[in-house]
Amino acid sequence: MNLRPEEISSVIKEQIKNYSMQLEVSDVGTVIQVADGIARIHGLENAMQGELLEFPGDVYGMVLNLEEDNVGAVLLGDMKNINEGDTVKTTGRVVEVPVGDALLGRVVNALGQPIDGKGPIETKKYRQIERVASGVIARKSVDTPLQTGIKAIDSMVPIGRGQRELIIGDKQTGKTAIAIDTIINQKGQNVKCIYVAIGQKASTVANIVKTLEEYGALDYTTVVASTASELAPLQYIAPYSGCAIGEEWMESGQDVLVIYDDLTKHAAAYRTLSLLLKRPPGREAYPGDVFYLHSRLLERAARLNDELGGGSLTALPIIETQAGDVSAYIPTNVISITDGQIYLETDMFNAGFRPAVNAGLSVSRVGGSAQIKAMKKIAGPIRIELAQYRELAAFAQFGSDLDADTKEKLAQGERIREILKQPQYKPMPVEYQVIIIFAATKKYLLDIEVSKIRSFEKELFEFIDTKYPEIPASIRDKKVMDEECEKALITAIENFKKEFTN
């Protein structure tokens, strides 16, 4: 064998030339205990709260507890292959999710990874899931309506862009239905939607995605799903991920709607984590910072000022109550954080009054500034007339000899209740809401039988569309009900009534 020294020396010289004295420093620790999705790690003196940790086998964890002699971390993946004695590295990063228009029409998990089988998400932009909410100076007051397409909400508890409105009610009262209808109603309104499913059955989420697809709403919607079968840490970070995806659009001057369905399960997932991390339990076994858990999430909803692009992020958190108990711990917390609540009642729902919005307990703390002028002008009496109806209906059960005035108030209340009923997945454009509410509040429905109100409404819209198309067009474009428009509407209703009663 012929050795050539000059060749060997040139290779060695080349390697010496390329040698660099760069050290790769990483803080490492050792797993001392792993169970229930929680790992305790010895070492990692420089770990930060919320930092990502790298475990063997491409599993990541997140630091939640910094104790004297160890670090408590939650695992964001399968813990099967993690054992005591394994080496863990810090990454110097916190949890990030992909953001941008590539996420529209997609279903992702809490880490932003696609789970809809439509291939990878083409985006180079990432955002940290936790962020300090915009300050007072960065915001401006809510003044643009976000139409839900639901008459009972848009007339009595209007929602503005940048508001946080809680949807609260028992199981099976139509909470998710209101949220989905609101998403469907944003078609063509230039609002991007994010639906965050926390701790729900995978089949339920699949049905929601299918519904959104059917109504053409998935094109402007991102679904972030952390189902009941997933680990508690993923359910815990899901709403923050959804919020981060929305903030990217908000900061580029767009309007975003985020639905958190629901925060009761989110709080339960956080309680699970906290108890496993041996944090001291408080009321209802929730940890002491469960208020901060939701306040730091919902406070990120905002309407930015014009210098920052004037974008908005509207939040509709959902809370599930037990037997209508609004004064439990989590419901009272979220009620105090949000700018109003839509309270859904089981009795109304079972009586066929759907959406089952209780007008007495539902409020919007933004109010009239989140309505178009036309709606503000005509929807005022509805709440009072409904309240009078409820009060009188209770008395009317006892006595039959009622005076004419009382009978009229009862009849008027019944008709208003009837026009507020609405089928699911049929949101109504605001101009048509204004027309039917105008007809009801101006007492044009008093001589129509209650059973015929729904068909009256349907046929009235058809009549106006064919003979007076300028009325809805005027309300839609000008957003006000001027004298001319009001006169035309009165004429249209009176002409239609002659046809309808004949």
Swiss-Prot record:
InterPro entries in alphabetical order: ATP_synth_asu-like_sf, ATP_synth_asu_C, ATP_synth_asu_C_sf, ATP_synth_F1_a_nt-bd_dom, ATP_synth_F1_asu, ATPase_a/bsu_AS, ATPase_F1/V1/A1_a/bsu_N, ATPase_F1/V1/A1_a/bsu_N_sf
Pfam families referenced in this protein's UniProt entry, alphabetically: ATP-synt_ab, ATP-synt_ab_C, ATP-synt_ab_N
Name of protein: ATP synthase subunit alpha
Catalytic activity from the UniProt record: ATP + H2O + 4 H(+)(in) = ADP + phosphate + 5 H(+)(out)
Record bears the keyword Hydrolase: no
Main location: membrane
Gene Ontology cellular component terms for the protein in this record: plasma membrane; proton-transporting ATP synthase complex
Family statement drawn from the similarity comment of this UniProt entry: Belongs to the ATPase alpha/beta chains family.
Subunit field text: F-type ATPases have 2 components, CF(1) - the catalytic core - and CF(0) - the membrane proton channel. CF(1) has five subunits: alpha(3), beta(3), gamma(1), delta(1), epsilon(1). CF(0) has three main subunits: a(1), b(2) and c(9-12). The alpha and beta chains form an alternating ring which encloses part of the gamma chain. CF(1) is attached to CF(0) by a central stalk formed by the gamma and epsilon chains, while a peripheral stalk is formed by the delta and b chains.
NCBIfam families xref list: atpA, PRK13343.1
Cellular localization per UniProt: Cell membrane
ATP-binding listed as a keyword: yes
Enzyme class: translocase
